[in-house]
Amino acid sequence: MCKMAIIPDWLRSHPHTRKFTHSRPHSSPCRVYSRNGSPNKFRSSSTTAVANPTLSSLDVKRILFQKITDRGDELQKAFQLLDTGQNLTVSKSELRRIITDFLMPLTREQFQDVLAQIPLSTSGTVPYLAFLSRFGGIDLYINGIKRGGGNEMNCCRTLRELEIQVGEKVFKNIKTVMKAFELIDVNKTGLVRPQELRRVLETFCMKLRDEEYEKFSKHYNIHKDTAVDYNVFLKNLSINNDLNLRYCMGNQEVSLENQQAKNSKKERLLGSASSEDIWRNYSLDEIERNFCLQLSKSYEKVEKALSAGDPCKGGYVSFNYLKIVLDTFVYQIPRRIFIQLMKRFGLKATTKINWKQFLTSFHEPQGLQVSSKGPLTKRNSINSRNESHKENIITKLFRHTEDHSASLKKALLIINTKPDGPITREEFRYILNCMAVKLSDSEFKELMQMLDPGDTGVVNTSMFIDLIEENCRMRKTSPCTDAKTPFLLAWDSVEEIVHDTITRNLQAFYNMLRSYDLGDTGRIGRNNFKKIMHVFCPFLTNAHFIKLCSKIQDIGSGRILYKKLLACIGIDGPPTVSPVLVPKDQLLSEHLQKDEQQQPDLSERTKLTEDKTTLTKKMTTEEVIEKFKKCIQQQDPAFKKRFLDFSKEPNGKINVHDFKKVLEDTGMPMDDDQYALLTTKIGFEKEGMSYLDFAAGFEDPPMRGPETTPPQPPTPSKSYVNSHFITAEECLKLFPRRLKESFRDPYSAFFKTDADRDGIINMHDLHRLLLHLLLNLKDDEFERFLGLLGLRLSVTLNFREFQNLCEKRPWRTDEAPQRLIRPKQKVADSELACEQAHQYLVTKAKNRWSDLSKNFLETDNEGNGILRRRDIKNALYGFDIPLTPREFEKLWARYDTEGKGHITYQEFLQKLGINYSPAVHRPCAEDYFNFMGHFTKPQQLQEEMKELQQSTEKAVAARDKLMDRHQDISKAFTKTDQSKTNYISICKMQEVLEECGCSLTEGELTHLLNSWGVSRHDNAINYLDFLRAVENSKSTGAQPKEKEESMPINFATLNPQEAVRKIQEVVESSQLALSTAFSALDKEDTGFVKATEFGQVLKDFCYKLTDNQYHYFLRKLRIHLTPYINWKYFLQNFSCFLEETADEWAEKMPKGPPPTSPKATADRDILARLHKAVTSHYHAITQEFENFDTMKTNTISREEFRAICNRRVQILTDEQFDRLWNEMPVNAKGRLKYPDFLSRFSSETAATPMATGDSAVAQRGSSVPDVSEGTRSALSLPTQELRPGSKSQSHPCTPASTTVIPGTPPLQNCDPIESRLRKRIQGCWRQLLKECKEKDVARQGDINASDFLALVEKFNLDISKEECQQLIIKYDLKSNGKFAYCDFIQSCVLLLKAKESSLMHRMKIQNAHKMKEAGAETPSFYSALLRIQPKIVHCWRPMRRTFKSYDEAGTGLLSVADFRTVLRQYSINLSEEEFFHILEYYDKTLSSKISYNDFLRAFLQ
């Protein structure tokens, strides 16, 4: 029972009845069946409905709702037909077939939108109850519709009875039955299976017993295994049905008479469920009247029932629940009629119902009074039905015209001056649609049958006015109509009327909108829009206007988006045909008055209204001149704007052709003869006419009589010309108001004025703007105007400065423009930043000099500590106080007042306001060999060596003690670690070691841990790692002590040749140590290390090895261009290296970097983005961390960190974020320590494990970048972001590990590849550029490398993968792994050739005396210069500016890395070998500096 209660009633079996039940009575059953028995009636239509792709989702939803409401029973039966399993679901294809056959065809996208709104089952099928409820508003679980009666027949029907009943059911609804057959017949074969035939009959006709169907199928030769032709079956059923009907005609007539007699006994509407066809015999007004009467009687019951259905007391119930309550206590009305009735009360079936407001309208006494006509009475005759239809139309018309009756009568009298004069049907219908209510074609036709029974085509206005007055009198005397307030028209009808009205008056409506929107922004004010709507739609109430505005209102500004309204009507652009322009204040009455003035006779007006396709009337010369006068005198903005669109400015002239276009666009079309006469009259010259000349001519008094005296060419007098100009004070007063009238905001005006789109406007542009605003100034007055604004002719303005000009505020003559104010503001900001940095340095110098002095490592020849720019900068960056280059220069100038470039400790502390103390303020001795370039005395070297030896001796002694007491220490550690975590704190470790007889200070213990590589976590140490390190130190502790006793070789005193030999000796004597060091770097045992790591290891073993010596060493070994060095080959074969066999030795060394995994590359890319985000938005990210850290623990959770990464870096997948989280500093509770994170990622180079080695030193030799990794990751910063003030610079004496900066890929000589590609790209470069732009969504000028490879294959460019890789490396200009397609296409299409010269002349290189020192001139050097000459000559000016931007000090010299970066930035075709030869020529002294002026001068002779 419970299961049956859940299933709707209409899913249960049909009962059967032997009586004939008709939805409406027919006069003769024979006529019905003879019509239905026609063969064409059940033949499938040959036409196929086509889906309309222009329908929006809202349109589809509205149409589906309407059709489901009308055909709900058919749809339910169709779903039941396909739902063979009775599980209340159908497949997606079955749902689409039902929608296509029974409702409307849909496109694939439209069907997907419908499907997306239905919850699918777990098996992917569609619950069709949800579909009907969602799109039809049918709550089938509450208000189910039964399939038939409830009882089956006990006796078996005869064959004749079956044929008659089945035939009646089939042919009464033949279209639905045919659609059901076609629904099953998916392949359109015309055949169905016998079981499917039975399902159709039982679903759409009646239930059949097995013996009845067996008898029926045997009669029609339907076998179980044979397909049935349903067209033939229906044809045979039709023939047999006609024969049977003739036999039982008498009984049928008797049953019909009994049914009609039974219906005639009813005095009111049936309280039980009745057929919709019976309700159709009553008008909606009568149903409404009796519905209100019955509701007033059951008001309390209805109120209690609705209150019970609103348990939350929100005041809203569903539409279906409202219908159930009203069906129970008032009338059980069919759903379609109920929806129409509720629309009269302003209710919709798709929204929640405010039941309290609904009942309030009936609770008032006047709302409960009804007419004295009593209950509904059924009208049987045709005349009475037609009469009621006419009354319905008149009632509907008067109900909606009661408020507008006066304006309706006025409009009728205006259009027809005679009170009893006729009016055409078209004019009458247009007035009704505009002033009253929109009538359908059938309703208007029935109204015309009463007003124009003779079908003359005209309507007597006096007759219609009498009907209006009579209706008003009747409504005053009638208690029902007087008491009842008219219902507002439903919004759907109002919206349709508004759209129709706008469509009819499209051009006038659009012109009036544009008159309020001169800038064509698509927005106007709400009040202006209301004025326009009252002109064209006076019937629009305030509530309807608010509803309309809510759909097309801009939320931000509150203005009306009228183009959105036009788009809803189906108009995407301005109308093409332009009738006469309608001014702002021209109402509909004025339009009718114009018709009244002309007033042609009735036949002419009829002809004009019928002929809708005629073109706009051509105007004569006199009419156009009169129109010109009005436009100039009233300053019509539409005409002026259209004129200026062609002339660009008031002084600009337009030709005769453009002037005619202006006339046509502003609604003044003329034929050629009249136009020629017009140009003659207004004095149009061959060179054209400006707007000022045109306006001056028509403002002149002689132009007042164009009919009598043709106007002379406009030659304004001098007084008029002077009066046309205004003074500077008047312009200053009018400028803000005119600007506000012409543009919606200052940005629009600035964008219009900035013709070259560079973000800057000059005073000439400002003058053009004033002319556009019709503010005409003479030159001297314009200069005075600029003076009032604090400007001058040479000044330029950006947008913020221009915006200040547009603000309404008093201007002063001594007020400067913002361009002069802005640098002062920046100066104030920079001074504030400098002062903050200065105060921080003061605090650190007073309290923590040891921390501050770690960055102060340089001394002069006298042993005094000195400071340079980099020392202060490194200190500030170490304390997370970054300054811009300009701010730092101001801070340094505050200390270095004499401009020496360095200051002493005494001078620095004096500037800080601190007294100098030699004992306290001394250089830091820690890490003394890692300082950046200093000059020391020999005595200082000896002191440093002594300190180093003492620390080494202490470390050896401590190590010996630890090894002697290893077992005791191990037992003590195990005993101390009671939690068994293997970790103990440093303090606890010191106590244990002291108890075991190995007393160590915290500094000594820290030094040991660092030397052994034992890591610390939250000030705790894994003692197992510590003990293991002690054991491993046994082998290294017994090293021979000769090296300790002997002084290390000082490479700084050797020349490069001697340095190479000494390096060979060091490598031979320290192979084991070198192998250990290289193995620590080569964790994957590939045999390769990066060039930067290789150089660092050698410099660690070769004391004081300079960069020049190291570079010379790499060149001798021919490995200076190798990004990866095979250290195993180097150690095994360097002892037998000879300079004579250097080439052969280098060729045998294995080449190629080890392959990297895609995940590692992606991780480096993410870390680079994270580093870039932190450095560029440091304070913002810090603030976000602090906002999350509400407990002030300096930690945040994993989810909070991920949210910041998603917002500041990029949205990461779970796998990517897991790998990133593993690299973050996390405490024991799994929370991120964001101070450590910020200090790690805010430095110039991201010190991350995955990024180690990806950056290279900006030097020659070891600075050769990583080809395989650098080009595939975005770790290296783009060249455009490497500003001179923020990039790291290395000193020649700086170890590689301390000066690692983001590197760039190597130079590439792709000239042969590009030369071969030119022929192929010449024919397809436009299409290639288009494809690249489509892939470049962000419009950055570059695309992914994979996209470029795909385009190479698509356009068949015939280049190998290696060549593609070379091109990708070359055009990765931003070092972000992307391909700069614009530069690539330009280099292939723009063929630059060298300057042609005579055979006796060749390019010269500077002589040696012009340069300080020049290197060797090789053939490779000359060939490289000759090849790149055209490119350098083409772009040498911007290249020189770029060189200067990298040369901060203005020395004319650049480092090798910066020089390489600039060459890559301009796509210079150079290989690394050629680059090496250029360096040899321009840097013979190996100073790692290139004179870029000497380099450029070679190409400019």
UniProtKB/Swiss-Prot annotation:
Residues 70-105, 172-207, 297-332, 403-438, 439-474, 504-539, 634-669, 741-776, 847-882, 883-918, 964-999, 1069-1104, 1176-1211, 1212-1247, 1359-1394, 1434-1469, 1470-1501 form the EF-hand domain. Specifically expressed in the testis. GO terms for molecular function: calcium ion binding. Its main location: nucleus. Transmembrane segments: none annotated. The keyword Transferase does not apply. PROSITE patterns: EF_HAND_1, EF_HAND_2. It is found in: Nucleus; Cytoplasm, Cytoskeleton, Flagellum axoneme. Disulfide bonds: none annotated. One of its GO terms (cellular component) is axonemal A tubule inner sheath. Residues 18-47, 699-718, 1246-1307 are annotated as: Disordered. GO terms for biological process: flagellated sperm motility. It holds the Pfam family EF-hand_8. Residues 35-47, 1270-1279, 1286-1301 have a biased composition (Polar residues). Residues 1407-1501 are annotated as: Interaction with AR. Microtubule inner protein component of sperm flagellar doublet microtubules. Binds PARK7. Part of a ternary complex containing PARK7, EFCAB6/DJBP and AR. Negatively regulates the androgen receptor by recruiting histone deacetylase complex, and protein DJ-1 antagonizes this inhibition by abrogation of this complex. Microtubule inner protein (MIP) part of the dynein-decorated doublet microtubules (DMTs) in cilia axoneme, which is required for motile cilia beating. This is EF-hand calcium-binding domain-containing protein 6. It comes from Homo sapiens.
